[in-house]
């Protein structure tokens, strides 16, 4: 051994003696051989008995409280990240009491799109609440039974079956081996290898069947022929028309959760999606006092997740896992009863706290469910006697605990020690008393808050004692005591709740990165002494989740104490049976929409219904609020704005107003705000948590995969019980956002699913590119308004699939590509703005030509008024919304996002030159004002039409004979009455007699200039109409009520008058 440098003891390997040769004569000692290559390390010996816990390192001073981050702008809600695989399950709580089922709120009707309000200012972002200490994971209540599956909508008609593909040509049969001699006479010759099968020859006469001879030996089987090539697949039959989606089944009652599957290794934590718009932050419940730090018992069965109950008091503080991203708040399940804590193992070293996960974006604040009844608080078991320790194998000599090194900058989390072999899991004992606290080492310096410092260097391990020989594996030692958690940094101040902004569109969630596998647990750091438990606050009523403030900087991690040996894990206690899942309470009222967040990327829209033909766009009505968005994927950037018809809401569009006679051209309404993508549909029920598997080593953070296509949303199941949150894995990098899907009709706001463990929010994909704003075309003369096309049928709301059970959080699929951003849901296609009719007499401005966008502008009556707006540049054509995909099942409809912003209003093209105003034709009646199309931007005022002639004021008729003058007042100096006949000499003013008869009227004086028209006196008899100006061809509808318009000079006004 020595010559090979292999020390069996230290290597722990097993030397395998070779057979001894006979001893030769003793030679003289040769020169010492060079040391041989180092032997490989033998397999690790059985773990020795756990050494005594090393002295506990001092509790690091609490890091400075994280500052509240500035309120961020409300991010667009990220697309909900795909749910990462559930982290390892925390201890399962005893089943919480199921809350009473809330009544299901009605799905509100989608209102017609209201006019888009201006976006309110984004509410201030609430200060981020400081992350509370992570309570020990409550034990998860039993999973409720899976809800019944909603009835599937009626199946659409089956698509035609595709033709079967042609059968591939059969390959030539392999040669058959020679047949054994046939038993019958007329020996059939051995069958030659079959060539490609020739035409079948005519069958020879059958020989007489001889008596069967003894069977000949079977010929060798010929090689198998090649399989024929597969035929081309037949053409796929046409898809049948999508069936009408059945009404979404009601979410069935939640079925019992299946056993919890092993937790997948946590994937890397996905990047956090952009923060959603902050919901209004409800009042924060009082912060419960942290319960005493129990030893973390084996995970109890997962409690059912009820509605979000009041915030349970924090369970004993477990070691802080890396903070997961904050998922959208689900309803908080009833707090499970506290599971019985298992015996406390010796304290492991405290691992350095993982880095805080990126802050997840808060989903839109769910309507707070009615608070479920708080589950009864599980009894905290009296500390039971520790379950029997498994037999400990013969202890290897305990390595000496290294003295804790001075806390270095917290180091990276050390490699996980080799995980001891788990002993059989003892039944979960009642929580043993906490182990004595190790003597605290000197306090580590307070690290700066913020990133997890690197774990301090671990003091040098004492020399390892020689490894004991590998004992039989003893039963696992009792689990080390869980180190006391380091003090939590003081919580950052809770952010004030921002007003709830209107949630921006959900960003497309990036795909959550794959959750890395969980590394072997590092040795548990010595826990710092638990902070004193604060008094347990009563549960506050659950507020709406406020916007999640930015996470405060993480306090500095305490220094990592020297690792105690990790005890073997005790047996896992049996999971409690899942209690029934309470019905999901009604969704609470939706918080007020705050100001709209910025438009996030458009969520994926549900499939767009096929656009109806657009009617001629009336004036654009104000956009109504968008219908609830289906869970929108990332909302694609608004596609090029097609010519807007009246924009139908995407999805179920409100019916476009009929185009009336073209009203006057309205100002374009603002486009409605883009609806935010609805909140993610309720999470499907979480699959039953399997037993917690050992955590694998953390995998590398997966690359962000490309997003998969968004799956159809299943029917929302009842929300599955959320398994206890495992530590959040690191979020994977966000996948690239897929293109935004088409915006489907917004589904009704789904009930807020229970908050899952917050999944890692995938990073939002970048919003799809905004469609280009078409440049405004010139306004053509308005054509006659096209008839409004029928409103496109909103795609049917796909059936909301039942949410499948919440599988383990798989690695988040890459977010599917968001569908391409649908172009803005189809406004029905606006009919092309009919070609501008010939400009009639400048009465109406013909409906503006193609700017199909604007409804036909009402008649712009008199000429010159806005020239007909040129066609608004094409809003890029609304691309064909692809044929509406089969409506995917819309995800559970998200809440109605704020109305999406309208795409940019195309600029109104320059108004075409107004035709010369003729005398205004008679103003045709103004058509009823069509719905106000978007007002394209007002086209440039066309050239004023020529001012029609002011019709001639009719010739002034000869002045009528003057009425008899009233009595003359005392005569002032009478002005010359036109030249009156020469005044007689004014006698002394007589009484006011009648004036002498007026002399015959003098010839009319020259026509004074027409004074401003005073009030029109009673019209004299109209003079003969002046000659009409040149016809403008438009009809004058000016006598109809018109919206005020900037009027061009109405040349016909005088004429009319």
Curated annotation (Swiss-Prot):
Is Acetylation among the key words of this record? no
Q: According to its UniProt record, what is one Pfam family this protein matches?
A: Collagen
- Keyword terms, alphabetized: Collagen, Extinct organism protein, Extracellular matrix, Glycoprotein, Hydroxylation, Phosphoprotein, Pyrrolidone carboxylic acid, Repeat, Secreted
4-hydroxyproline occurs at which residues?
29, 32, 35, 44, 47, 50, 65, 80, 86, 95, 101, 128, 131, 137, 146, 152, 173, 182, 185, 212, 215, 227, 233, 242, 248, 251, 266, 275, 278, 290, 292, 299, 314, 320, 323, 329, 335, 353, 362, 368, 374, 383, 386, 395, 404, 410, 422, 431, 440, 443, 461, 479, 485, 491, 497, 503, 509, 521, 530, 542, 554, 557, 563, 569, 578, 596, 611, 617, 638, 644, 647, 656, 662, 680, 689, 698, 710, 716, 725, 734, 737, 758, 764, 767, 776, 785, 803, 812, 815, 821, 836, 842, 848, 857, 863, 869, 884, 887, 890, 959, 962, 965, 983, 998, 1001, 1004, 1019, 1022, 1025, 1028, 1031
**Annotated Basic and acidic residues bias:** 1-10, 68-82, 932-946, 1046-1057
For the modification Allysine, the affected residues are: 9, 1047
In this chain, the stretch annotated as Nonhelical region (N-terminal) covers 1-17
What does the UniProt function comment say about this protein?
Type I collagen is a member of group I collagen (fibrillar forming collagen).
How is this protein named in the record?
A: Collagen alpha-1(I) chain
The source organism is Mammut americanum (American mastodon)
Q: Organism classification, top ranks?
A: Eukaryota, Metazoa, Chordata, Craniata, Vertebrata
């Amino acid at each position: 051994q020595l010559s090979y440098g292999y020390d069996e003891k230290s290597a722990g390997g097993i030397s395998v003696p070779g057979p001894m040769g006979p001893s030769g004569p003793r030679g003289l000692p040769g020169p010492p051989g060079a040391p041989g290559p180092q032997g490989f390390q033998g397999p690790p010996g059985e773990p020795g008995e756990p050494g005594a816990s090393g002295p506990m390192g001092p509790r690091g001073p609490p890091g400075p409280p994280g500052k509240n981050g500035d309120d961020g702008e409300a991010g667009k809600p990220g697309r909900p990240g795909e749910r990462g695989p559930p982290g390892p399950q925390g201890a399962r709580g005893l089943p919480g009491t199921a809350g009473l089922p809330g009544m299901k709120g009605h799905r509100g009707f989608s209102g017609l799109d209201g006019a888009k309000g201006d976006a309110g200012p984004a509410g201030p972002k609430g200060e981020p609440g400081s992350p509370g200490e992570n309570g020990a994971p409550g034990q998860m209540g039993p999973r409720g039974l899976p809800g019944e599956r909603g009835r599937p909508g009626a199946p659409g008609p089956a698509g035609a079956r595709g033709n079967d593909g042609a059968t591939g040509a059969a390959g030539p049969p392999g040669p058959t081996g020679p047949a054994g001699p046939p038993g019958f006479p007329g020996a059939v010759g051995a069958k030659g290898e079959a060539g490609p099968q020739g035409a079948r020859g005519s069958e020879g006469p059958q020989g007489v069947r001889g008596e069967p001879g003894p069977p000949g030996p079977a010929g060798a089987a010929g090689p198998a022929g090649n399989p024929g090539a597969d035929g081309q697949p037949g053409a796929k039959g046409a898809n049948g028309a999508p069936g009408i989606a059945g009404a979404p089944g009601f979410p069935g009652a939640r079925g019992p959760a299946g056993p919890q599957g092993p937790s997948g290794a946590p994937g890397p934590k996905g990047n956090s999606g952009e923060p959603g718009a902050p919901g209004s932050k409800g009042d924060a419940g009082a912060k419960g006092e942290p319960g005493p730090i129990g030893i973390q018992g084996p995970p109890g069965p997962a409690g059912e997740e009820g509605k979000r109950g009041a915030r349970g008091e924090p369970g004993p503080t477990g070691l802080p896992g890396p903070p997961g991203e904050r998922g959208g708040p689900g309803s908080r399940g009833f707090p499970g009863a506290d599971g019985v804590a298992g015996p406390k193992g010796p304290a492991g070293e405290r691992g350095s706290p993982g880095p805080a996960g990126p802050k997840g974006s808060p989903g839109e604040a769910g309507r707070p469910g009615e608070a479920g009844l708080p589950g009864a608080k599980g009894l905290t078991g009296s500390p039971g006697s520790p379950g029997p320790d498994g037999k400990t194998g013969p202890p290897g000599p305990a390595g000496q605990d290294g003295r804790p090194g001075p806390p270095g900058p917290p180091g990276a989390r050390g490699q996980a020690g080799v995980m001891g072999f788990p002993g059989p899991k003892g039944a979960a004992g009642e929580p043993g008393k906490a182990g004595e606290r190790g003597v605290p080492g000197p306090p580590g310096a307070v690290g700066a808050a913020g990133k997890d410092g690197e774990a301090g260097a671990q003091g040098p391990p004492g020399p390892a004692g020689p490894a004991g020989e590998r004992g039989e594996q003893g039963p696992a030692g009792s689990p080390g005591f869980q180190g006391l958690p380091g003090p939590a940094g003081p919580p950052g101040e809770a952010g004030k709740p921002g007003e709830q902004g209107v949630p921006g569109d959900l960003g497309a969630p990036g795909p959550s990165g794959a959750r890395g596998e969980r590394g072997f647990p590092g040795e548990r750091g010595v826990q710092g002494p638990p902070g004193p438990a604060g008094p347990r606050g009563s549960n506050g009523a659950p507020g709406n989740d406020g916007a999640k403030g930015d996470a405060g900087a993480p306090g500095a991690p305490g220094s990592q104490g020297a690792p105690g040996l990790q005890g073997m894990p005790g047996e896992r206690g049996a999971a409690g049976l899942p209690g029934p899942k309470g019905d999901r309470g009604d969704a609470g009222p939706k918080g007020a929409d705050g100001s709209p967040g910025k438009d996030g990327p458009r969520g994926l829209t549900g499939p767009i219904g096929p656009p109806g033909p657009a009617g001629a766009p009336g004036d654009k009505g104000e956009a109504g609020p968008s219908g609830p968005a289906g869970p929108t994927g990332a909302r694609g950037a608004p596609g090029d704005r097609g010519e807007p018809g009246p924009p139908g809401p995407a999805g179920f569009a409100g019916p476009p107003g009929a185009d009336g006679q073209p009203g006057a051209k309205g100002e374009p309404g603002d486009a409605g705000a883009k609806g935010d993508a609805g909140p993610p549909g309720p999470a499907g029920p979480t699959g039953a948590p399997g037993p917690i598997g050992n955590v694998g080593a953390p995998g590398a953070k997966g690359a962000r995969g490309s997003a998969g296509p968004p799956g159809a949303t299943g029917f929302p199941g009842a929300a599955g019980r959320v398994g206890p949150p495992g530590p959040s894995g690191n979020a994977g990098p966000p996948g690239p956002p897929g293109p935004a899907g088409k915006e489907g009709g917004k589904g009704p706001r789904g009930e807020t699913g229970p908050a899952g463990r917050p999944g890692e929010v995938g990073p939002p994909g970048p919003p799809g590119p905004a469609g280009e704003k078409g440049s405004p075309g010139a306004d053509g003369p308005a054509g006659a308004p096209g008839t409004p096309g029928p409103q496109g049928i909103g795609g049917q709301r796909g059936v909301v699939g039942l949410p499948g059970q919440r599988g383990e959080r798989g690695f988040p699929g890459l977010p599917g590509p968001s569908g391409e951003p649908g172009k803005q849901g189809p406004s029905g296609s606006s009919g092309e703005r009919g070609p501008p009719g010939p400009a009639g007499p400048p009465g109406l401005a013909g409906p503006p030509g193609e700017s199909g966008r604007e409804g036909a502008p009402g008649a712009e009556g008199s000429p010159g008024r806005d020239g007909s707006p040129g066609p608004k540049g094409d809003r890029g054509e609304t691309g064909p919304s692809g044929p509406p995909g089969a409506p995917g099942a819309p995800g559970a409809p998200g809440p109605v996002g704020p109305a999406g912003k309208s795409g940019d209003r195309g600029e109104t093209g320059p108004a075409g030159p107004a035709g010369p105003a003729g005398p205004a034709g008679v103003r045709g009646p103004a058509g009823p004002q069509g719905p106000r199309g978007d007002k394209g931007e007002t086209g440039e005022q066309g050239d004023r039409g020529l001012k029609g002639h002011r019709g001639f004021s009719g010739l002034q008729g000869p002045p009528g004979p003057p009425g008899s003058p009233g009595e003359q007042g005392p005569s002032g100096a009478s002005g010359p009455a036109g030249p009156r006949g020469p005044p007689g000499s004014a006698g002394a003013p007589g009484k006011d007699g009648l004036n002498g008869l007026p002399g015959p009227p003098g010839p009319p004086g020259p026509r004074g200039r027409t004074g401003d028209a005073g009030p029109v006196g009673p019209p004299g008899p109209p003079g003969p109409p002046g000659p009409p100006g040149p016809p403008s061809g438009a009809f004058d509808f000016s006598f109809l009520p018109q919206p005020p318009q900037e009027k061009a000079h109405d040349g016909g006004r005088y004429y009319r008058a």
